[in-house]
Amino acid sequence: MNGTTGFGMAKLMEDAANGAFKTEKYTFDVKTDFAKEVLPALINGDADIAAIPTNGASIAYNKTQGKVKVLAVNTLGCLYVIGKTEIASFADLDGKTVYAPAQNPTFIFKYLCGQNNVNVTIDNQYSAPADLVAAVAAGKVDYAVLPEPMITVAKAKNADLKVSLDLTAEWNKLDGKQDTLVQGCVVVRTAFLEAHPEAVANFLSAYEASVNYVNTNTEEAADLIVKHGIFAQAPVAKKAIPKCNIHFVAGDDMKAAMNTYLTILSGINAGAIGGKVPDDAFYYLGK
């Protein structure tokens, strides 16, 4: 998918275009809508591997009765509170209205508000991040929850905006929750994995290298992100990459983090993960 979830794929896409891989041939298709485009492609077999939101992976697994597995986490939390004025902590939001995109940003923020014992009204009037960016930049809302790179886009439109709370840092303060706010992942069709285990292993190796490249070569990576249609603005991508929490987490660490995160989401809205927390067969552990 486009946006942060796809950022880590940029170098792999460039290498594939340059013929760097001798045993695998990759074809990439950047999509914007998980439910309407990516999920059907996984179900129909039009896509073998996809970078998607972690709750989307759970939905795909439950909907297909195990025909999709998660390979690795690729994005930790990239949500922030932005607004007209700076705040020091969740306590400063008590009694206020905060605007948030629908689905995961709302669920995550609601959970953190509960954990911090603050009473906040969450408004989903601007359900799409792009619409909320416009409203924030225009001064129509006092506080909003937005992901990177949308935070950087908003700041580019209105330099007076204040970014106050890093929701990943706030999440990590909770007991036993360190590095479990996992918002993006890479999945594979189970049938493809079973038929081509070596190809999947090779992909993961190349993908991990790509993620590392993006994190250490932000200027070059930003250009590749634009070149391959993952995001439209290279200057924004360059500024946003260090704050996007792009990672490669596989194996038991991936399983533990995703299980914790999906269990929390299930407690807020089971429908957000496809009805139930996936069982152990959901996870590819490379064994």
Regions found by a protein language model. Name each.
Residues 25-34, 49-52, 119-128:
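Short beta-strand-to-loop elements that line the ligand-binding cleft
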Residues 1-17, 84, 88-153:
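Bilobed "Venus flytrap"/periplasmic-binding protein-like clamshell domains
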Residues 193-268:
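Secondary-structure end/capping motifs
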Residues 55-56, 128-224:
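Pocket-lining segment of extracytoplasmic ligand-binding domains
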Residues 66-73, 96-99, 173-182:
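A structural signal for short loop-to-beta-strand junctions that line the ligand-binding cleft
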Residues 70-89, 181-194:
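Hydrophobic/proline-rich hinge and linker segments of small-molecule sensing/allosteric domains
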Residues 259-287:
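Conserved C-terminal helix/tail region of periplasmic/extracytoplasmic solute-binding proteins
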Residues 1-37, 43, 60-63, 110-114:
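Short, polar/charged alpha-helical segment
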